[in-house]
A protein has these predicted regions:
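Amphipathic alpha-helical "coupling" segments that flank catalytic cores
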Residues: 1-479
C-alpha cells in the first residue's frame, strides 16, 4: 500500500471558502478512486488561507486485473441463415479487440445475445493519478471563483504552485502551466524559503517547523490558547476571560496559518453602548474576541489574532486599538443619534422600504401584521390583544435606525433597546426582539407569548403573500 500527498498553494483564500473546499476535495478524491476500483484507507484534508492539501493513506498501488463481459447484438442479428457470423457480429468483436471466433452466445432476460469476454489488465496507480488530480482541481467549486492571466481554469484565488508525491516520487501533474514538484514553502513572513517535501507522513511536521499549522483542528486549539494567553498577560483583571464565539473561532482559524494573540484596550466610554453592539462591532467587523469579567459583564478589552509572531506587542495592540476606536466612535454616534427619535415616530417611514415588489412596502407588511397578530391574540389570549398590536406596530421600526443600517444582524435587538429607552413596557420591548426568533431551524424560540404571536403573524404574512404571487418559499431558511 502507498500514500499520496497533494498540495495546492494559492493566494489567500477567503476564510469561509476553506472548510467546504476541503470537504469537496475529500469527497471528490474518494469518489474518483472508487470509480477506478482502487482501494484506499483514510482520506485526509488540511487547509490554511494559502493551501489546500489532500492525503490518501494505504492507496492500492495497482488496479486488479479483471474480466469484463460485453454484450453485443442478438443471436438473430449475429448469424445469417447459413449460421455464419454477420458483419454486425464481426464488427462488435473487433471493436472489443477480440477474434470473432471467440464470441459466445448467452441467455439474457431479453433472449439470446452475443457476448465477448475481455481480459483487462489493471493499470499502475501512478499512471492514473495525474489525470485524477488535475480533474480534482478543475472540479472544485467555490462561492465565487476567478480567472487569472489567460488560463481557462477558474479557482478561488490564483494557484501559485502544486506539489504531488506518490510514495515519495513526484507525479507529472500540470495545470495551466503550473507543474507539480516536491517543493513547498513555510509561513510567508517567518519561513518563506523553499524546502523539499518528503511525503505524507512528515507533511504536518515539516510545515509546523516552518510556522504553518496545516491541521485546522490543531490551529483552532492554538487560536483558543493564544487568545487566552493574551488576556492573561495583559488584562490585569482577576477572572477576565475572552468570549469564545464558535463562529468567530472558525473564521479566525481560517484567517491565519500561525496564530498569535494580541490583547488591546478601548475607552471605557464605549461601555455605555449596548453589549450586543460592542460584541457585534468587534466580532463581525474586526474579527476580535470581546473580553468579559468574572461576573460576565464586558470589559474594555479585546483580543486580535495576528498571522505572525509579534515582537512589539504594544505597537501591534495600538494599531488594532486605533481601528476599533473608529468603529466604536461610529457606533456611539449612531446610538446617541438614534435615541433622539422614538421608534413610534419612525413607523410611517417604513413606506420607503420595499418588502417585496409585488407585496408592497414594509409599512404595508407592518399593517398586515397588526391585523393578523390582533386576530391571533383575540383567539388565543384576548387580554394581550392591545400589547400584541403595539409590538406588531413597532416590530420593524428599528430597520430605519442608523445602528441597524450599520449592523443588520442587530435588527430586533436594537428594537428592544430603543423601546426600553422610549419607556415602552419591558414585555413589549422583549417581544420586539423575540418576534424574529427562531432565526434558523433548531434556534432559540420566543420565551413570551407576545413575541410568539407577533412572530407567527410575521411569518404567516410572508408565506401567504409569497404563495399568492406565485413565489413558492423554499426550505433554505425560515420565512
Amino acid at each position: 500500500m502507498s500514500e499520496l500527498l497533494f498540495e495546492i498553494v494559492t493566494e489567500e483564500i477567503p476564510a469561509v471558502y476553506i472548510q467546504p473546499a476541503l470537504e469537496s476535495l475529500a469527497a471528490g478524491a474518494a469518489k474518483k478512486l472508487e470509480a477506478l476500483e482502487l482501494s484506499f484507507g483514510a482520506v485526509r484534508t488540511y487547509g490554511t488561507p494559502r493551501r489546500l492539501t489532500l492525503i490518501v493513506d494505504e492507496l492500492q498501488s495497482r488496479q486488479a486485473d479483471r474480466r469484463q463481459e460485453h454484450v453485443g447484438p442478438s443471436k438473430k442479428a449475429g448469424y445469417d441463415d447459413g449460421g455464419n457470423l454477420t458483419k454486425a457480429a464481426i464488427g462488435f468483436a473487433r471493436s472489443k479487440g477480440c477474434d470473432p471466433s471467440l464470441l459466445q452466445v448467452v441467455e439474457t432476460p431479453k433472449g439470446e445475445y452475443l457476448m465477448v469476454v475481455e481480459d483487462v489488465k489493471g493499470q499502475e496507480t501512478a499512471a492514473l493519478l495525474p489525470a485524477l488530480l488535475e480533474s480534482l482541481i478543475r472540479e472544485l467549486v467555490f462561492p465565487k471563483s476567478m480567472k487569472w492571466a489567460d488560463y481557462s481554469i477558474t479557482f478561488a484565488r490564483p494557484i501559485q504552485w502544486l506539489a504531488a508525491l506518490y510514495d515519495g516520487a513526484v507525479l507529472p501533474v500540470q495545470v495551466e502551466g503550473v507543474e507539480c514538484g516536491r517543493t513547498s514553502r513555510g509561513h510567508r513572513f517567518l519561513a518563506p524559503a523553499q524546502f523539499e517535501l518528503t511525503g505524507a507522513s512528515t507533511y504536518l511536521d515539516d510545515l509546523r517547523a516552518r510556522f504553518v499549522i496545516a491541521d485546522p483542528m490543531e490551529r483552532r486549539e492554538m487560536v483558543v490558547k493564544e487568545v487566552q494567553r493574551a488576556v492573561r498577560e495583559v488584562s490585569g483583571v482577576a477572572g477576565a476571560a475572552p468570549i469564545l464565539h464558535e463562529g468567530l473561532l472558525d473564521t479566525v482559524t481560517n484567517l491565519v496559518e500561525y496564530p498569535y494573540g494580541v490583547c488591546g484596550r478601548f475607552d471605557e466610554k464605549f461601555l455605555q453602548l449596548p453589549e450586543e453592539t460592542l460584541v457585534t462591532s468587534m466580532r463581525e467587523h474586526q474579527k476580535y474576541f470581546p473580553v468579559a469579567g468574572s461576573d460576565g459583564t464586558l470589559l474594555p478589552l479585546f483580543v486580535a489574532v495576528n498571522n505572525t509572531k509579534i515582537d512589539d506587542l504594544s505597537l501591534a495592540a495600538s494599531g488594532h486599538q486605533r481601528v476599533l476606536r473608529a468603529r466604536l466612535e461610529d457606533g456611539l454616534f449612531f446610538y446617541n443619534d438614534d435615541r433622539k427619535r422614538p421608534l413610534a415616530d419612525r413607523c410611517p417611514e417604513l413606506q420607503g422600504i420595499v418588502f417585496q415588489n409585488k407585496l408592497g412596502t414594509m409599512l404595508a407588511k407592518s399593517e398586515r401584521m397588526i391585523k393578523l397578530a390582533g386576530f391571533l391574540a383575540q383567539t388565543i389570549a384576548p387580554d394581550l390583544k392591545e400589547d400584541v398590536k403595539r409590538v406588531a406596530t413597532l416590530a420593524k421600526a428599528d430597520l430605519l435606525t442608523a445602528m441597524v443600517g450599520e449592523f443588520p444582524s442587530l435588527q430586533g435587538i436594537m428594537g428592544r433597546v430603543y423601546a426600553l429607552h422610549d419607556a415602552e413596557k419591558p414585555e413589549i420591548a422583549q417581544a420586539i426582539e423575540e418576534h424574529y426568533l427562531p432565526v434558523r431551524a433548531g434556534g432559540e424560540i420566543p420565551r413570551s407569548l407576545l413575541g410568539a404571536l407577533v412572530g407567527i403573524a410575521d411569518r404567516l404574512d410572508t408565506l401567504v403573500g409569497c404563495f399568492a404571487i406565485g413565489e413558492k418559499p423554499t426550505g433554505n431558511k425560515d420565512a
